From Swiss-Prot:
Residues 459-468, 697-721, 740-758, 771-782, 789-803, 818-831 have a biased composition (Polar residues). Keywords: ATP-binding, Kinase, Nucleotide-binding, Phosphoprotein, Serine/threonine-protein kinase, Transferase. This is Serine/threonine-protein kinase PKH3. Residues 723-738 have a biased composition (Basic and acidic residues). The modification Phosphoserine is found at S696, S753, S871. Belongs to the protein kinase superfamily. Ser/Thr protein kinase family.
């Protein structure tokens, strides 16, 4: 290290090399020595502080400064560090060979010579790191670079820990619960990548030198097999495989070495490294004495650190040019990154581009969307960092989308006003289940509805209208303006022969190529498949791109509905109507066996593939036709067949999931809210029927009140008219109120004085026989609540009482044709409130479950609500206190209970 002060002005910044969790790496030239090439890591101060990355930057700087004191060929060297007002700068070795993972993806697997040579270099480098009291804690092929000659160089020490107390306190963490093993000082913080995490970190929340050796064993296996040994459908499954040693070479599996012979010595070496107990895991010194390295002279450092291209007389350029032109940034499917978060606001970066082949941080990758992860819940439970960041925070966030160029800011999955949009969507799916809709109806609405209603409406019309029709009519009376405008806008874009389906989220022309699953067939071909991974998909696309595009046959119209159902129709370009009218069901977004992959999918450039996989059933390669192909289709046909072409397909898939989750939450809320659906079901004792209620008018009866939790009925003395109240009617009788003789008799629709006795049969004959009132019934002064069902249920009566207490009794309006002006009635009731109302405790319960009208409750919020309010909860707060180990045990515990 030199003490001369440097600054960004001393360097010429070239192209961007990669993107890390909190930094961007550039190729740079020294202005004073142009022949010197460096890699400069630029860290945004604003982002570091915002994302709480100061700790990791300090760790990396201190660790690399310590290692740079004695330069080692296998360690990236730190030359200078400096900063300006906006950024921190790390001047590092330039590695023109790229990442080791990129080379592995190109080669598929390494032969025995390369495997032994790379492993020997890793062992020597790890021995040097451990000799300085440093644990890397995130060793994986992505964090190993290659120089021009093919030598390995370990990088990315942001997760490192040290047992040297001379370093920063954040860099070293000591565990007092040491078991006295050979790595007797361990770190107790959760870092690393899911597929390389050691079992002691999961089981005991400890990490030592043996954790790096475990990661080395995983890498040796990956060199030979092409993929890590432990790979689950999600992080929890991966962790379970790790602690169970569930991998092809594990003790419980029979090794099939006939198809592709593997050196048995390397199998034996991996089996001795991948051991659960740290005390039984072989050390680096024992690995060096293993028979697999019998021909390696560990004292001959020159031979060990000879580059692979150097030893074979090949240059880096010859090797890379000789490889097939396959995208090298393709990620292994289901490989999930645990610790990294995409950088977002580094000022010096002009064009955001993900770090090549970085897990969850690449633009040319297959991004896994396994529905069973839940996108947020599955990862949050494990303490993973990337999933806690919403996809809307930046258009280049690869947790949702991998190709940033394909999605402009106008097409982000959740726009800033997404909350209001979510409310509208939820109302469209189930408009009768949202409690906040009730208080919208105020006195003005009720007062205006009475004069418009004529008293002599024929009651026979109500009996001739079916229940289903009357309910929908009542619903449209409240929400018709917004619905009609929306339908007019949508139908205006369609052909006159077609009518739009409001349940369709998106519909457009695509190419679809389906490949069925066959257990005995090839791994992956155009005709069948029995295995899926990134290498197979990459090879298939590279060799059969035109066939998958299917551009010479016909187009399909792909339809995604709000119910989550995905289907398509064939649209033959020649005009064959037989295939066009047949609908083919593909899958439902809610299907737990459905996965979605993004292979360079870009809707703007119409390139790449959106891949859907139904587990052991079929794979669909979905691509978009070019604009020239679309121009051959008649304009009217395009207009009539495309819906919502302003929103991209990936966003619509996530929106469909969101709508389904919202519907599930609405179903949960409906079980605890006071809507008519929950209370319309019979329970014991049964509520008083409509036909029996007129007989009890004027008598004191005991009504049934529902508990807020499960809807059970309790006998409680209440006002005699509460059980028979229409929605938003006055819950009292003129006979029971003080001073009732001077009160207008129409205050209760069913309690009439002798002046109105003649109209009683006329009005009741029209209402009593029916289970659902018609539109005419509602316009007679009775505005429906919730789902506009009849008012015989107790749930609506309870809500009426809630509204009267919160807004005052003046919100209720009479509906009798002989009613005096509403102002008089309201003015008279104020000095004489109903006596039973102050005794009711329902408003407290309603506050517990209701939500503001502009907020949609997510499933996690709903569960937290009930967890915090449930005194008998089974959630163990002590277990899920810190780290991956705690999260793993907590999830294991919850899984056993299920």
């Amino acid at each position: 290290m030199t003490s001369r002060k440097r600054s960004p002005h001393d360097f010429i910044f070239k192209e961007e090399l990669g993107h890390g969790s909190y930094s961007t790496v550039f190729k740079a030239l020294d202005k004073k020595s142009p022949n010197k090439i460096y890699a400069i890591k630029v860290c945004s101060k604003k982002h570091i502080i915002k994302e709480a990355k100061v700790k990791y930057v300090t760790i990396e700087k201190n660790t690399m400064n310590l290692l740079a004191q004695k330069h080692h060929a296998g360690i990236i060297k730190l030359y200078y560090t400096f900063h300006d007002e906006e950024n921190l700068y790390f001047v590092l070795d330039f590695a023109p060979g790229g990442e080791l993972l990129s080379l592995l993806h190109k080669m598929g697997t390494f032969n025995d010579i390369w495997t032994r040579h790379f492993t020997a270099q890793l062992i020597d480098a790890l021995e040097f790191i451990h000799s300085h009291g440093i644990i890397h804690r995130d060793l994986k092929p992505e964090n190993v670079l290659l120089d021009r000659d093919g030598r390995l160089m370990i990088t990315d020490f942001g997760a490192a820990a040290t047992i040297d107390p001379s370093l920063s306190g954040d860099s070293a963490k000591f565990n007092s619960d040491s078991n006295g093993s050979k790595d007797n000082q361990n770190c107790a913080s959760f870092v690393g990548t899911a597929e390389y995490v050691s079992p002691e970190l999961l089981l005991y929340n400890q990490c030592g030198y043996g954790s790096d050796i475990w990661a080395l064993g995983c890498m040796i296996y990956q060199f030979v097999q092409g993929q890590p040994p432990f790979r689950g459908e999600n992080e929890l499954k991966t962790f379970e495989k790790i602690v169970a040693l569930d991998y092809p070479w594990g003790p419980n599996n029979r090794i099939n070495n006939s198809t592709s012979p593997i050196n048995p010595l390397v199998i034996n070496l991996v089996q001795k490294i991948l051991v659960i107990e740290v005390n039984e895991r072989i050390s680096l010194e024992q690995i060096k004495r293993h028979p697999y390295f019998s021909k390696v002279d560990w004292n001959d450092k020159i031979k060990i650190w000879r580059g692979i291209w150097q030893s074979q007389g090949q240059s880096l350029q010859q090797t890379t040019l000789g490889l097939p032109n396959i995208p090298q940034n393709i990620l292994p499917t289901r490989q999930l990154h645990v610790i990294d978060t995409p950088a977002r606001s580094i000022q010096i970066t002009k064009q955001k581009r993900k770090k090549p082949t970085k897990i969850s941080n690449t633009t040319s990758s297959i991004v896994v969307w396994r529905k069973r992860l839940g996108i947020s819940t599955g990862k949050d439970d494990l303490g993973t960092v990337p999933s806690t960041t919403p996809a809307v925070t930046a258009p280049n966030d690869t947790n949702v989308l991998t190709n940033t160029a394909a999605h402009s800011t106008a097409n982000i999955a959740l726009p800033p006003n997404s909350q209001s949009n979510q409310v509208k969507r939820a109302q469209l799916v189930a408009p009768n289940r949202i409690p906040p809709k009730v208080p919208v109806i105020n006195d003005n609405v009720r007062n205006k509805s009475i004069p418009r209603t004529k008293p002599n409406v024929p009651p026979l019309q109500t009996s001739s209208i079916p229940q289903k029709l009357s309910t929908s009519s009542a619903s449209s009376a409240l929400s018709a303006p917004s619905t009609e405008i929306r339908n007019q806008d949508l139908t205006h874009t369609l052909d006159g022969r077609n009518s739009i389906d409001i349940h369709v989220l998106k519909q457009d022309y695509v190419f679809i190529y389906g490949i069925p699953y066959e257990h005995e067939g090839p791994a992956m071909s155009l005709n069948s498949y029995n295995k899926i991974d990134n290498d197979l998909i990459t090879s298939l696309v590279a060799q059969h791109k035109e066939e998958l595009k299917n551009s010479e046959s016909f187009l399909q119209v792909l339809t995604l509905k709000k119910s989550g159902m995905l289907s398509y129709k064939n649209t033959v370009m020649e005009g064959n109507d037989d295939q066009e009218n047949k609908e083919h069901q593909m899958a439902n977004i809610e299907d737990t066996d459905l996965s979605m992959y993004d292979f360079e999918f870009n809707e703007l450039t119409r390139k790449g593939f959106l891949i859907l996989e139904k587990y052991k059933n079929r794979i669909w390669f979905i691509s978009l036709p070019s604009y020239s192909t679309l121009s051959k289709i008649p304009f009217n046909a395009v207009k009539s067949s495309t819906i919502n072409n302003n929103e991209n397909w990936v966003d619509c898939f996530f929106r469909a999931r969101q709508l389904l989750e919202e519907k599930q939450i609405l179903d949960k809320i409906s079980n605890v809210s006071f809507d008519s659906k929950a209370s319309s079901e019979p329970s014991s004792p049964p509520p008083i029927s409509r036909k029996e209620r007129p007989l009890s008018i004027g008598n004191n009866v005991t009504t049934l009140s529902y508990t807020a939790k499960n809807g059970s009925q309790n006998n409680a003395p209440q006002n005699d008219n509460v059980g028979e109240e229409k929605p938003f009617r006055i819950p009292s009788s003129t006979k029971d109120r003080p001073g009732a003789n001077s009160t207008p008799s129409s205050r209760h629709p069913r309690v009439l004085s002798s002046n109105n006795a003649g109209e009683t049969p006329k009005k009741m004959n029209g209402r009593l026989p029916n289970s659902a009132p018609s539109t005419n019934t509602y316009t007679n002064g009775s505005v429906p609540a919730f789902n506009h069902r009849p008012s015989t249920n107790v749930g609506n009566n309870k809500h009426n009482i809630l509204t009267s207490k919160k807004q005052g009794s003046s919100v209720f309006s009479p509906s009798s044709s002989t009613t005096k002006p509403q102002i008089k009635t309201t003015g008279y009731r104020q000095p004489t409130p109903s006596p039973p109302l102050p005794q009711m405790e329902f408003p407290t319960t309603r506050e517990k479950y209701s939500a503001p009208s502009n907020m949609v409750i997510s499933s996690s919020r709903y569960e937290v609500l009930h967890t915090l309010n449930n005194s008998q909860t089974n959630f163990d707060r002590e277990i899920a206190s810190r780290g991956a180990s705690a999260a793993f045990r907590s999830l294991q515990k919850s899984k056993k209970k299920k």
